[in-house]
Structure formats: C-alpha cells, structure tokens
Amino acid sequence: GVKKCACDSYYAVDMEFKNSWKSYENYLDIVNEVDKLLENCNYKNRVDIVITGGEPLLYWNNQEFQNLIKHYINKNHKLTIETNASLNIDFQEEYQKNILFSMSVKLSNSLEPLKKRVNKSTLTKILENTKESYLKFVIGNDFLENAIVEIEDILKNIPQCEVYLMPLGDSSEAIDINSEKVVNLAIKYGFKYSDRLHIRIWNNKRGV
C-alpha cells in the first residue's frame, strides 16, 4: 500500500475520498447546516466554532470564507482556525484579529521539507495580530529529543506564546503509549499538555 504522510486526516485532502466531500455555494449554506446541527443537539449556549481541515488557510483570500468567519465573530462566537501556519496571510480586517489560531506546526517527522513546514513570517503575523493564538506540536515517544530541538528553534525570533504538546496516535492505545512521556516532556520544558479526548473515546472515527 501507499503510506500517507504529512496529514493525519488525509481523507480531507486526498482526491480518493472526493465523493464523500460536500460542497456549498456560499457561506450561508454552511451557517444553515450548522444551525440544523445545533437544533438537533438542543444546545442552548453560544458554541465555539472550529474550522479545521485539511488546511483552512488555503481559503484565506476567498470572500465566502471570510464572510463565514465574520458572521460568527459578529455574533460573538469564539472562532478557532486549526492550521499548520505554513501559508502566507495578511490581516486586512479588524474582525480577523478576533480569530484564535491553533497552529500545529509540522516537525521533520512529517517528512516535509523545512521551507514547507515552518513559516516564521506567518507565525509572527498571527501572534502579533491576535490575542490567544498558540502553537501545538504532536509528537510520539520515538521523536522526543529531536522534537524539543526543533521546537526550540521554531520559537526563536517569534513573539512569545503558549505552547502545547500533544501525544501522537489515532487510537486510544496509541495515545496511552505516548502520553506519559509527552506529559513529562511538557512539564520539563514549561509547555502545556493537550490530550486527544475524542480519540480516546471514538478512536479514529470520522465526523466526531
């Protein structure tokens, strides 16, 4: 078989899965879809909106994408974009500064070249223009020492921010194997630890 690298949700980007993707004509179609989901779960509090991928910043310059972001921010939702922060973006609108960017920068074990993984210009722009954005690194037991060297290099010459370490794994068993050493590494270097609760509960089930 073919080994899938670089993206842990390759069904979101691999054309092999295109028949499972859903297209929308405009941002209001997405809003209506989300509203239906909220009605079904009978959730009465204001929800946090998380845009993930794939890579959402591929659509940063798309007006419908910006309309979607603006819609939820204007309604006082907390809006998070999960990104690897490798693409160039500019902050041209004030509402964009209210986005929380969860920046999962890839390390060398993703097998992608450095120039495609680390964009310090984008990291700096995001951290200078937003208040709560943070960096997150997903690592396993076999990459701990190398990961710290790479993380410390990434943190050089960018604004200070929170840093989270997350255990690698697409099953509860894999998370169990990696979590203890990743926790200890976070404690040692003053980082925060983020677990993968959805994987502990549902393993790698899609749509949760």
Give the role of each language-model region.
Residues 1-97:
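Conserved Radical SAM active-site core
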Residues 46, 57-208:
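Conserved AdoMet/S-adenosylmethionine-binding subsite of the radical SAM
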